[in-house]
Amino acid sequence: MNRNIIIGFLAALLLASCGYPKKPEAAAPSPQGAGKDNLPLNAQLIGSTPIKNQGKSELCWAYGMLATIESEHIMKGDSVNLSVAYVARMMLQEKALEYYFAQGKKPISMRGMASMLIHYIDKYGAQPYDSYEDPKDVNYKILCRKVEKICDGAIAQKSGIEKLKDELNNLFDKEIGYMPAKQVHMLGAEYTPLEFAHSVCYPEEYVSLTSFTHHPYREYFALEVPDNAMHDQFLNLPLDELMLHVQKAVENGHPVCWEGDISEEGFTHAQDNYVEVQKIELPVTPASRQKEFEQLRTTDDHVMEIIGTFLKDKKRYFVCRNSWGKNWANQGRIYLSEDYLRLKTIAVFMSEAAFLYNQSPKDTPQKPYI
């Protein structure tokens, strides 16, 4: 097999866990970056926690949103590193009960949108990463099938949910890890998981933004993508305004959680970690963006955290921190061009403080918060 074929094969593997089923399951090191640091000196970067690796999971939405929450705290001089494994365990338990009561007619999946993370920690709380670290070798797709098998047995025996919960907890302890203590100890204080979650992210702290022309601007609507299982509402903004909010948020030290399409050639074959759109796709307009979405060429593939921005040759780029480990791209980071964001963004999430910077609250419609 020649070198070009090998590189092409590895690049295809980059369409990792958060892609649709037709895309490969797991991330692999990028042949373009090989973990080398080629970040321009003029890049403005926001503080962030260490790069994590989602492995063979579909949990990019949880990794990306938790990373955004962590960076927002670092910006404030606080330090917090949050557990994805805890959220995954709570989600699996909830979906197992739904599967049981649906008598097996509601398959279990770990896919989701970044906004779902807020719902889960608001309901179940959160744990520090050090208290419940991500297991290195768990395959959540296989784990979902194991959960369904246990539920199928409980359905056949009509055994009830208490016995089912015991069996599930035994499975989760073995596959994900034993649950930490009931109290969270942080900086000399003691919290319940729910109190801890609300201390790092209160329910109304983050806003969800998008830009499409099939709904009125400055109104909220439920995004029509398969992973919006909770029918979350997004504020619809004109494209230029959406991009300005992203740029200003990052320039003022706030992270932004980005959700969008990574199936493009510009992403899978990024040159020196720079992600561009094709020349025939320029200029990117609201109409061309809408056409990509309506013809299903812009799909909800992946979630990353935007932690910086810079100009190169008079073009703006956004530094995205991924969850595919430090050996991918530039030590886990890649640079999306402004045109790529304009064309391939499904939604962005930022703190209310970032959104309202230089904007009067009266200019924004009353929102159904995440």
Show which residues each predicted segment covers.
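N-terminal regions that are enriched for targeting/export leaders
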Residues: 23-46
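Second-shell loop/turn segments in exported
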Residues: 46-58, 101-109, 229-236, 245-246, ...
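Papain-like cysteine protease catalytic cores
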Residues: 82-190
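Positively charged n-region of N-terminal signal peptides that target proteins for export
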Residues: 1-4
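Bacterial signal peptide processing site
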Residues: 19-21
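C-terminal motif of bacterial Sec signal peptides marking the signal peptidase cleavage site
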Residues: 15-17
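Active-site signature of cysteine proteases
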Residues: 166-370
